[in-house]
Amino acid sequence: MRFTILLPSAEGKEPGGNPLAPDMFDYRSSNTFNYFSDLNPERRALIDALQAEIRAADDAALEKLFGVKGDTLQKAVDANLGIYRSPLMAAVDRYGPGVMYAATDFAGLPTGSQRRLLENGVIFSGLFGLLRPDDLIPDYRLKMDAKVAGIGKASTYWREPLSKALNKLVDGHAVWNLLPASHEAAWDDAETYGRMIRVKFYREDEAGERTAVSHGVKELRGALVAYIVNETADSADALDLWEPPDGYEVDHEETELNEAGGGTVVMVSSPGWETRRAARRKARAQLEAEAAAAKRAREEEDD
């Protein structure tokens, strides 16, 4: 089963890039060489509208547009005004400083896992709509829920063209949806894919009270991305063997999956997880040892 991982872009970005890189992401001219090239007209229109607003706006309006102040605001202005002449960098590297991408640690993944992420990852971007992780992009700043003069909210602007491109791509795939609400708002999932998998994380205290994880959820999603591509995970069942940080475990009673295998997986970190994880490891090791012994016995009989 083919799978796709839907990822958000990151606010934190690696500056710089290669000014001599082949213009694979050619939003700068009429040529189209990037994966989602059908989105180029919308990209150019949004970039032009954004740059026009920057030139016309005062500091207060720019602070509202980008959600930052001071030196960070000036860097955002400079980056966005320089988009058409900036050096380029693969999206997965550009977003590398972002918390989720740092937790995935693309550079530290095995070569096969890197290839699977490049081939199966799709990134939602406020400025570019959809990206492959290896699409070449400049430095920029624009959130998916930002409102640009003459365009409106980026997520609304992208909804129709993005949905058309994405729905065609993921048809028949298992879809790991790791998008926050602001990014998912840009996608009209009219067909409600049966194989779409969402993962929710909760912490449980000694009294059994659960709270949804907000602080730290990006790190967990990054670790999940690494696990998916390392294990070529195309079903929610694969999460039973995942050992994420802080002992999160699948709660099968709260997890809701349909017949096609899609739905919401609930993972919980609760007191005593260290003991339970050690017991599971011991049980798996015993099963593996028994299987190996049985295999040797069969081979000896064949001889």
Each predicted region: which residue ranges?
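Near-N-terminal "mature-domain entry" segment
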Residues: R2-L142
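Short, surface-exposed beta-strand/loop "edge" segments at domain boundaries and coil↔beta transitions
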Residues: E14-P15, W273-A278
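Internal, well-folded beta-alpha domain core
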Residues: F106-T275, A283-Q286
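Intrinsic disorder/low-complexity signal
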Residues: R284-D303
